């Protein structure tokens, strides 16, 4: 890690002997050359082997040496003192005064100096700036004054530091003045959909690069991100990915920054600390007591837990462990991968979502950022409670949805996959797969929530292979009846309960269809006798509905197993000699019912 504790002292370049109020030579003040044309701007002011200060994504300057220059992308390949290497944009590189006698403006690269836009020399780095080129504009009183003047770059270099910028001293006051304006136009920045990164890599007051998921604050008004090192309102150093703040920058407030801590819950503390541990140690799983709780206790003051601050140290572990076990869509236990059960990690390594941005998750889930994007993890339902949603994954009780989007998208996927597998012949000849008609959404809540969790990828637990035909799955109709081969019959018959329809493992033969037809004939005969009697005795439809939900697998066969949330995978498809289509299906062997 680069050391930037002495960023301000790293400006060891020799300053220009010219004073800020000293008139520049005549040759430098002329606006044109002898031929009457303006001086041509140099293509690049950097040289290979040149020592420079480069601003990193934390807002601090680090000393490095230029090894390569890319004029097309306006960037330099720099090797830093700790042997790390990176491409840095020209806008984030600061050089010392040039050794030549000519002085040009660092911004416009022009060498003229005339009122009211004279050239002013920085007393720290020796760079020259036109009064109107510098941000903010340099007042004319600075030219006539004997006090030292520092350019914007040097003010930030001497005041910014880890944990927050200086709050007292002349340089701190100068920083506050500099922060009233930005060296770029916020409206010109091209942001991503989540407003977390922009194409120009321009953030904060300093205009340098940044990583929103590390130590940065987002202004709730202009939505720009600001480095921890550049703000002056922090009382304690920030944690990585800690966005539980209401922050207003100096530009929007037209004065000092505004900062307010948002309340934390135990799940937020566990999530935030696990994220910090993963960033620091570059691994996923941590011991919940030896590592996680140690980190929480050591950084208890930096967490600013609010109402939880008075919780005794002996009781904290109980609350944290409860949160780790309750939010299974957010945390992953080691026992899921055959490790120790007291090991925990984040399912997706993203920072926790603060409550003040929960309303934006419907438009842009947290997991869609390009740094942490994982395919197939996108919430499709509106988010009503920030505690039920984490990083774009909707919590549905203890059932987790991994690897595919839930909700309507899954139903469409089932429909598209299943429709080609069906025809009228297969439906009429396979009674165990007959399905109900139209769906009653309000009456089949528990049922429909399970149907959306069908997984085509299979599972790692015990499996069994059977042959059946996959068909479209629907919910319960309002009449709580279903249509079967042209006749109406009740959906729930207690004494005719059968098993789930799992056939013994055997080779698929044409005689299977004959067995199915025999069973269908017997079944139709029984239902014909009981049809009128049962319809007259269905007084309490609510009880019948509950019974139907509990025994749905008895009548729907393979579709019933799908309705109960059992995962399956289609392994093969074949057409028999008599034209029947059969499928080889691998079942997980366990359902959610």
Swiss-Prot record:
A Gene Ontology biological process term: segment specification
Q: Which Pfam families match?
A: Mtf2_C, PHD, Tudor_2
Give the compositionally biased regions (Basic and acidic residues). 360-374
Q: Which domain of life is it from?
A: Eukaryota
Does the record carry Transcription as a key word?
no
Glycyl lysine isopeptide (Lys-Gly) (interchain with G-Cter in SUMO2) crosslink location in chain = 360, 522
Q: Where in the cell is it found?
A: Nucleus
- For the Tudor domain, which residue ranges apply? 44-101
What segments bear the compositional bias annotation Polar residues?
Answer: 23-32, 445-454
Q: Which Gene Ontology cellular component terms are annotated?
A: cytoplasm; ESC/E(Z) complex; nucleoplasm; nucleus
Q: Where are the zinc fingers (PHD-type)?
A: 102-157, 201-255
Modification Phosphoserine, positions: 452
PROSITE patterns, per database record? ZF_PHD_1, ZF_PHD_2
Which keywords has UniProt assigned to this entry? Chromatin regulator, DNA-binding, Isopeptide bond, Metal-binding, Nucleus, Phosphoprotein, Repeat, Ubl conjugation, Zinc, Zinc-finger
Segment Disordered: which positions? Answer: 1-35, 360-411, 424-486
Q: From start to end residue, where is composition biased (Low complexity)?
A: 459-471
- Chief place where the protein resides: nucleus
Q: Where is the composition biased (Basic residues)?
A: 12-22
Annotated domain remarks: The Tudor domain recognizes and binds H3K36me3.
| Biological function | Polycomb group (PcG) protein that specifically binds histone H3 trimethylated at 'Lys-36' (H3K36me3) and recruits the PRC2 complex, thus enhancing PRC2 H3K27me3 methylation activity. Regulates the transcriptional networks during embryonic stem cell self-renewal and differentiation. Promotes recruitment of the PRC2 complex to the inactive X chromosome in differentiating XX ES cells and PRC2 recruitment to target genes in undifferentiated ES cells. Required to repress Hox genes by enhancing H3K27me3 methylation of the PRC2 complex.
Q: How does it assemble?
A: Associates with the PRC2 complex, which consists of the core components EED, EZH1 or EZH2, SUZ12, and RBBP4, and various combinations of accessory subunits including AEBP2, JARID2, PHF19, MTF2 and EPOP. Forms a dimeric PRC2.1 (class 1, PRC-PCL) complex consisting of at least SUZ12, RBBP4, and PHF19 or MTF2; PHF19 and MTF2 stabilize the dimeric structure which enhances PRC2 interaction with chromatin.
Family named by the database record: Belongs to the Polycomblike family.
- This chain belongs to which protein, by name? Metal-response element-binding transcription factor 2
What species is this protein from?
A: Homo sapiens (Human)
Q: What is the lineage of its organism?
A: Eukaryota, Metazoa, Chordata, Craniata, Vertebrata
Name of the gene encoding the protein in the UniProt record: MTF2
């Amino acid at each position: 890690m680069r050391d930037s504790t002495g960023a301000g002292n790293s400006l060891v370049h020799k300053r220009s002997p010219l004073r800020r109020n000293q008139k520049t030579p005549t040759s430098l003040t002329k606006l044109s050359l002898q031929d009457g044309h303006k001086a041509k701007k140099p293509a690049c002011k950097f040289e290979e082997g040149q020592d420079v200060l480069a601003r990193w994504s934390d807002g601090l300057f680090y000393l490095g040496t230029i090894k390569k220059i890319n004029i097309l992308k306006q960037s330099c390949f720099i090797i830093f003192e700790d042997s790390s290497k990176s491409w840095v944009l020209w806008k984030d590189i600061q050089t010392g005064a040039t050794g030549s006698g000519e002085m040009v403006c660092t911004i416009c690269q022009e060498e003229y100096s005339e009122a009211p836009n004279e050239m002013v020399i920085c007393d720290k780095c020796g760079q020259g700036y036109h009064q109107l080129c510098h941000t903010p504009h340099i007042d004319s009183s600075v030219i006539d004054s004997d006090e030292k003047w520092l350019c914007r770059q040097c003010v930030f270099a001497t005041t910014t530091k880890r944990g927050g910028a200086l709050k007292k001293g002349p340089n701190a006051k100068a920083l506050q003045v500099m922060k009233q304006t930005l060296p770029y136009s916020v409206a010109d920045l091209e942001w991503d959909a989540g407003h977390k990164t922009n194409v120009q890599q321009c953030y904060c007051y300093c205009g340098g690069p940044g990583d929103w998921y590390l130590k940065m604050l987002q202004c709730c008004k202009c939505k720009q991100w600001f480095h921890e090192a550049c703000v002056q309102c922090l009382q304690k150093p920030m944690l990585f990915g800690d966005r539980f703040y209401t922050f207003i920058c100096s530009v929007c407030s037209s004065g000092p920054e505004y900062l307010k801590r948002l309340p934390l819950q135990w799940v937020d503390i566990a999530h935030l600390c696990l994220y910090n541990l993963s960033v620091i140690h570059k691994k996923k799983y941590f011991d919940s007591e030896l590592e996680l709780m140690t980190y929480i206790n050591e950084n208890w003051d930096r967490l600013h837990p609010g109402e939880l601050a008075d919780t005794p140290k002996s009781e904290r572990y109980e609350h944290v462990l409860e949160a780790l076990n309750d939010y299974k869509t957010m945390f992953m236990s080691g026992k899921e991968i055959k490790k120790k059960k007291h090991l925990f990690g984040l399912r997706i390594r993203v920072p926790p979502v603060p409550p003040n941005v929960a309303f934006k998750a419907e438009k842009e889930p947290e997991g869609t950022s390009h740094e942490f994007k994982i395919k197939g993890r996108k919430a499709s339902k509106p988010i009503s409670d920030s505690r039920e949603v984490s990083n774009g994954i909707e919590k549905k009780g203890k059932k987790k949805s991994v690897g595919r989007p839930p909700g309507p998208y899954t139903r469409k996927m089932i429909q598209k996959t299943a429709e080609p597998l069906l025809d009228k012949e297969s439906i009429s000849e396979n009674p165990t797969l007959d399905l109900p008609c139209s769906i009653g959404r309000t009456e089949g809540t528990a049922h429909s929530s399970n149907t959306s969790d069908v997984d085509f990828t299979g599972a790692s637990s015990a499996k069994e292979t059977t042959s059946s035909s996959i068909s479209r799955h629907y919910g319960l109709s309002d009449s709580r009846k279903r249509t079967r081969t042209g006749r109406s019959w009740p959906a729930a018959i207690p004494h005719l309960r059968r098993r789930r329809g799992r056939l013994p493992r055997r080779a698929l033969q044409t005689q299977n269809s004959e067995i199915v037809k025999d069973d269908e004939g017997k079944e139709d005969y029984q239902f014909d006798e009981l049809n009128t009697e049962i319809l007259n005795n269905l007084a309490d439809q609510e009880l019948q509905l509950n019974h139907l939900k509990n025994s749905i697998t008895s009548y729907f066969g393979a579709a019933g197993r799908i309705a109960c949330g059992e995962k399956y995978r289609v392994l093969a498809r074949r057409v028999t000699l008599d034209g029947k289509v059969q499928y080889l299906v691998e079942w997980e062997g366990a359902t959610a019912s």
